[in-house]
Swiss-Prot record:
Catalytic reactions of this protein: 5-amino-1-(5-phospho-beta-D-ribosyl)imidazole + S-adenosyl-L-methionine = 4-amino-2-methyl-5-(phosphooxymethyl)pyrimidine + CO + 5'-deoxyadenosine + formate + L-methionine + 3 H(+)
GO CC list: cytosol
GO-annotated molecular function: 4 iron, 4 sulfur cluster binding; carbon-carbon lyase activity; zinc ion binding
Binding site for substrate: N81, M110, Y139, H175, S195, R196, G197, D236, A237, L238, R239, E275, Y302
Biological function: Catalyzes the synthesis of the hydroxymethylpyrimidine phosphate (HMP-P) moiety of thiamine from aminoimidazole ribotide (AIR) in a radical S-adenosyl-L-methionine (SAM)-dependent reaction.
Cofactor note: Binds 1 [4Fe-4S] cluster per subunit. The cluster is coordinated with 3 cysteines and an exchangeable S-adenosyl-L-methionine.
Source species: Aquifex aeolicus (strain VF5)
Any single biological process term in GO: thiamine diphosphate biosynthetic process
Binding positions for Zn(2+) per the UniProt entry: H279, H343
Protein name: Phosphomethylpyrimidine synthase
């Protein structure tokens, strides 16, 4: 892949975005690359990007990035959040987290660093990442302002956004949808505002008595994004922090504004996706996906989980993957992973691995439910390998081959058992596969009976 050459050829364009080029009728090399990865026609990809239903987050300065897409008419994607805090982690650790996330299948990563050396950490992550890197620039601005609302100026925020764009960040969470008039709507909530960026901007508005500066200066942000092809990830500052607060007036009021901002970004030919909850009980997940598609004009929906219960700290990657699978089936384009450390602390490298795998499971389950072409081929190959006792093939096909092999080795470590027609669960006498194969040898195909014409959905 020679992305440097692709970008160089397009230097004459003032607006560098994939959306702008798509609307000019141009099928870019990034679109062709994405089409091959997704099994789609390049012209279809161009149409989806032009329409805004698909984004290709690919900053022109992240030249070793392998283009990917996020959209309702593509495979469900997974994002992994990494980044330091003021109390823990360092650059080598965050780089290792990035590598592990990518190894286990993260489609994008976000650097959410809030501690020391934010710029240097981000640079190191971008340098090792072959997937798009996202950020939340208000964090760095808040760090520079030392948590002082008076020092958090519009110029500072815009300078941080421009510097991050210049560095190669492909998408940024911009909390432009939370407005001053929304603040009274959170008073009844159990957990108020749980978005860090949202809380910072709420404090800014409350103390200045002014409107959200990201909303007021949205056009200026669009001008920056056009130069570097940065995509908006329109932040849900008022996402619910517990299922009790789900789908309330505050969340929905902000969602309507996000829909307006999508159209505003599109007027600049800037790509945009919309962030979503959060904490949502299972029976409300589908509604949340459908209303976003309606109000946000089918811009890709990027959801955090959602968690469908609040009582499983230490296992929130499981509780949220349940919601994520349903969300992906109902229309979410990308799932932001949650790790076992959610609500408890900063994830370590192993937590990142566990979170990514949980969400790759959720995304794949959603692709199967959506009847995505070829999605079930992987599962069919695994099933055939299982029934044929091809243990090494099973390990090879597993989402986490090392763990699958290690679990088998716990009781049957010798290499000879990798061709055995049983495992330690049933042993050679109780293996249903083995018994079933013997039955099949004795039953003639002519003995099959007609069983109706019903077809599974």
């Amino acid at each position: 892949m020679l992305r440097a050459e692709w970008v160089e050829k397009r230097k004459r364009f003032k607006n560098k975005t994939q959306m702008h080029l798509a609307r000019q009728g141009i099928i870019t090399e990034e679109m062709e690359y994405v089409a091959k990865r997704e099994g789609l026609h390049p012209e279809f990809v161009r149409q989806e990007v032009a329409r805004g239903r698909m984004i290709i987050p690919a900053n022109i300065n992240h030249l070793h990035l392998e283009p990917m897409c996020i959209g309702i008419n593509s495979k469900v994607k997974v994002n992994a959040n990494i980044g330091n805090s003021g109390l823990a982690s360092d650059i080598p650790t965050e780089v290792e987290k990035a590598k592990v996330a990518i190894k286990y299948g993260a489609d994008t990563i976000m650097d959410l660093s809030t501690g020391e050396a934010i710029k240097e950490t981000r640079e190191a992550i971008i340098n090792v990442s072959t997937v798009p890197v996202g950020t939340v620039p208000i964090y760095e601005a808040w760090k520079i302002a030392k948590g002082n609302v008076k020092e958090l100026t519009v110029d500072l925020i815009l300078d941080v956004i421009e510097e991050q764009a210049r560095q190669g960040v492909s998408y940024m969470t911009i909390h432009a949808g939370i407005l001053r008039e929304h603040l009274p709507l959170v008073q009844h909530r159990v957990m108020g505002i749980v978005s860090r960026g949202g809380a910072i901007l709420a404090q800014w508005m409350a103390e200045h008595g002014k409107q959200n500066p990201l909303y007021e200066h949205f056009d200026k942000i669009c001008e920056i994004f056009k130069k570097y092809d940065v995509s908006f990830s329109l932040g849900d500052a008022l996402r619910p922090g517990c299922i009790e607060d789900a789908t309330d007036d505050a969340q929905l009021a902000e969602l309507k504004v996000l829909g307006e901002l999508v159209e505003k970004a599109w007027k600049h030919d800037v790509q945009a996706m919309v962030e979503g909850p959060g904490h949502v009980p299972l029976h409300q997940v589908e509604f949340n996906m459908k209303i976003q598609q309606e109000w946000c004009h089918e811009a890709p929906f990027y959801v955090l989980g959602p968690l469908v219960l609040d009582v499983a700290p230490g296992y929130d990657h499981i509780g949220s993957a349940i919601g994520g699978a349903l969300a992906g089936w109902a229309g979410a384009a990308m799932l932001c992973y949650i790790t076992p450390k959610e609500h408890l602390g900063l994830p370590n490298v192993e937590d990142v691995k566990q979170g990514v795998i949980a969400y790759k499971i959720a995304a794949h389950a959603a692709d199967i439910a959506k009847h995505w072409p070829g999605a079930r081929d992987w599962d069919l190959a695994m099933s055939i390998a299982r029934y044929n006792f091809d243990w090494n093939k099973q390990f090879e096909l597993a989402m986490d081959p090392e763990t699958a092999r290690a679990y088998h080795d716990e009781t049957l470590p010798q290499e000879g058992y990798k061709t055995a027609k049983f495992c330690s669960m049933c042993g050679p006498e109780f293996c249903s596969y083995k018994i079933s194969q013997k039955v099949q040898e004795k039953v003639s195909p002519e003995e099959l009976i007609e069983n109706g014409n019903w077809v599974a959905p």
